[in-house]
């Protein structure tokens, strides 16, 4: 009997433990599901920890999000709110996993322990909750904790309620100090960044846009370069986050920043001279003439010494070239650190409006940078964009004084030493219209792109698309495109200038007024009846239709 009672006790105890195990298993399974929902939702109280292994949810490891057919119409409506696929963004975890897109040589680099601390300044205006918080979480989760002094979120007068108290409540619970600073009125990126920089405390200031994702190892190589030389300003490689699917695509380490005649920032291939300077080691930083401006790190004291941003500029536009010129001309160095990768949502259109329109604002900002930093080379810009000369660009005396105080070099030095492959030719025979003697029409790039035919149109004398440079290298150039003929009788197309002469070599005879294409031995001619909007190229015959006047454009009110 005693033995039977003992067996019953053992069985009962075992049954209790089995039931308890089943309960715990079910409980934690449900908790995991709840956590997953919290990660993907809107405001949540829990702090999201770094992802240790790839999840299987939408967008994990940077994969594209596919929206079901039945949700396509709703997706299109939501797209208009921020000019990116908001539905896709809200499906993705705030701490999603990303691939390690660094070069193999970058993954084994070792950095000093005593790197400077940084304050990360992020300006936002009516930003989506998911993209803003994904930016914040990527900074926290993929940065050594002791290197992040704080994150400063600068609200440029947002109107959306969830960016008010809910945002403040959320960031208070994060394991890195996050401060929300409010601009009293819509001030624009430039002044909002200045506000964020002024309240920040880190030894380095890192500026990011509000729709970024930092990848593993992004911060250390940036801070290491600044520790090596505090006058070095550094940018990560900017990877592309699709505005349509939020797919994460690695950017190239073989491009760097430049600009065209209209002072638009452009990406161009890293020249061979820069590859030679680095002895072919692609893990070494690239010296870049300009930066895109959205993402960079700079020593706090150096930022003050070189004049921060030009506070006379409005909203955004041109500030990236202005600070790029200033860094180089005033003794600093600007680099793209190829071992640092940060993703950025590139939008095809801006969702924001500005008083007076973006064109007027950018014209004012570009006029200020041209007047202060470009010396006589501002002529190129004004001839291409004559409307700029009519804008009120304010008082620039303090910025001119800054240039003198810092003993900055002339813009010609910048072109010769930092950007010798600039689209601005330093030596040329003419800059202006190329007019046909018989028809009185002018060559016109028609705002066409590379590989398209050059046009011809009635001369309007307003510069812009009818400005061509006949360079000392005997190229006929419009911005970074050169007139190119690859076969007899044309067509005459616009291709990237390669400086190798060949199909882009033209001989102008100032007596006969002919433009002879050297390779084909044919002459530029007026348009044909078959195509009245493009010039032709034919055997030279001395006719008036093959005579061209190369006229320099001047703007007496400026020069």
UniProtKB/Swiss-Prot annotation:
Task: State the source organism's domain of life.
Answer: Eukaryota
PROSITE patterns for the chain: RICIN_B_LECTIN
* InterPro entries the UniProt entry points to: GalNAc-T, Glyco_trans_2-like, Nucleotide-diphossugar_trans, Ricin_B-like_lectins, Ricin_B_lectin
Which residues are exposed on the Cytoplasmic face of the membrane? 1-8
Pfam families associated with the record: Glycos_transf_2, Ricin_B_lectin
* Keywords of this entry: Disulfide bond, Glycoprotein, Glycosyltransferase, Golgi apparatus, Lectin, Manganese, Membrane, Metal-binding, Secreted, Signal-anchor, Transferase, Transmembrane, Transmembrane helix
| A single Gene Ontology CC term | endoplasmic reticulum-Golgi intermediate compartment membrane
Cross-referenced SMART domains: RICIN
Identify the residue ranges that face the Lumenal compartment according to the record: 29-559
Functional description taken from the UniProt entry: Catalyzes the initial reaction in O-linked oligosaccharide biosynthesis, the transfer of an N-acetyl-D-galactosamine residue to a serine or threonine residue on the protein receptor. Has a broad spectrum of substrates such as apomucin-, MUC5AC-, MUC1- and MUC2-derived peptides.
Name of the molecule in the record: Polypeptide N-acetylgalactosaminyltransferase 1
Which species is this record about?
Answer: Homo sapiens
């Amino acid at each position: 009997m005693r033995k039977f009672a003992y067996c019953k006790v053992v069985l009962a105890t075992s049954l209790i433990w089995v039931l308890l195990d089943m309960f715990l298993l079910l409980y934690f399974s449900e908790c995991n599901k709840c956590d997953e929902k919290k990660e993907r939702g809107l405001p949540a109280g829990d702090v999201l920890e770094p992802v240790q292994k790839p999840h299987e949810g939408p967008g994990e490891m940077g994969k594209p999000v596919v929206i079901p057919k039945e949700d396509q119409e709703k997706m299109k409506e939501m797209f208009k709110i921020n000019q990116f696929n908001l539905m896709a963004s809200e499906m993705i975890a705030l701490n999603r996993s990303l691939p390690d897109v660094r070069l193999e040589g970058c993954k084994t680099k070792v950095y000093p322990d005593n790197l400077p601390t940084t304050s990360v300044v992020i300006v936002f205006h009516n930003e989506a909750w998911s993209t803003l918080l994904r930016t914040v979480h990527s900074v926290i989760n993929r940065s050594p904790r002791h290197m992040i002094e704080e994150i400063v979120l600068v609200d440029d007068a947002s109107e959306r309620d969830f960016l008010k108290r809910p945002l403040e409540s959320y960031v208070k619970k994060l394991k890195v100090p996050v401060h929300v600073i409010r601009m009293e009125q819509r001030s624009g990126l430039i002044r909002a960044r200045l506000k964020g920089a002024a309240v920040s405390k880190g030894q380095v200031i890192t500026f990011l846009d509000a729709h970024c994702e930092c990848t593993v190892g992004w911060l250390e190589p940036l801070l290491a370069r600044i520790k090596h030389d505090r006058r070095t300003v550094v940018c990560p490689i900017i990877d592309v986050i699709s505005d349509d699917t939020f797919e994460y695509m690695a950017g190239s380490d073989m491009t760097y920043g430049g600009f065209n005649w209209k002072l638009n920032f452009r990406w161009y291939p890293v020249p061979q001279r820069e590859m030679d300077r680095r002895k072919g080691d692609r893990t070494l930083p690239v010296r870049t003439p300009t930066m895109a401006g959205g993402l960079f790190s700079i020593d706090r004291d150096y930022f003050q010494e070189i004049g921060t941003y030009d506070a006379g500029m409005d909203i955004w536009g041109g500030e990236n070239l202005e600070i790029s010129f200033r860094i180089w001309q005033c003794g600093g160095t600007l680099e793209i650190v190829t071992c640092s990768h940060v993703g950025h949502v590139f939008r095809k259109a801006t969702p924001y409006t500005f008083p007076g329109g973006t064109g007027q604002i950018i014209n004012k900002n570009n006029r200020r940078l041209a007047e202060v930093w470009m010396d006589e080379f501002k002529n190129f810009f004004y001839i291409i964009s004559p409307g700029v000369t009519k804008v009120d660009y304010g008082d620039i005396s303090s910025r001119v004084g800054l240039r003198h105080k810092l003993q900055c070099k002339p813009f010609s030095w910048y072109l010769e030493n930092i950007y010798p492959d600039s689209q601005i030719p330093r030596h040329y025979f003419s800059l202006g219209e190329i007019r046909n003697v018989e028809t009185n029409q002018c060559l016109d790039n028609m705002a066409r792109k590379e590989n398209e035919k050059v046009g011809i149109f009635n001369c309007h004398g307003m510069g812009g698309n009818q400005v061509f440079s006949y360079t000392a290298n005997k190229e006929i150039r419009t911005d970074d495109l050169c007139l190119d003929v690859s076969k007899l009788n044309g067509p005459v197309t616009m291709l990237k200038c390669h400086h190798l002469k060949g199909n882009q070599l033209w001989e102008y005879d100032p007596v006969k007024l002919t433009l002879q294409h050297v390779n084909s031995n044919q002459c530029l001619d007026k348009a044909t009846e078959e195509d009245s909007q493009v010039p032709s190229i034919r055997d030279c015959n001395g006719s008036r239709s093959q005579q061209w006047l190369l006229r320099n454009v001047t703007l007496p009110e400026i020069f």
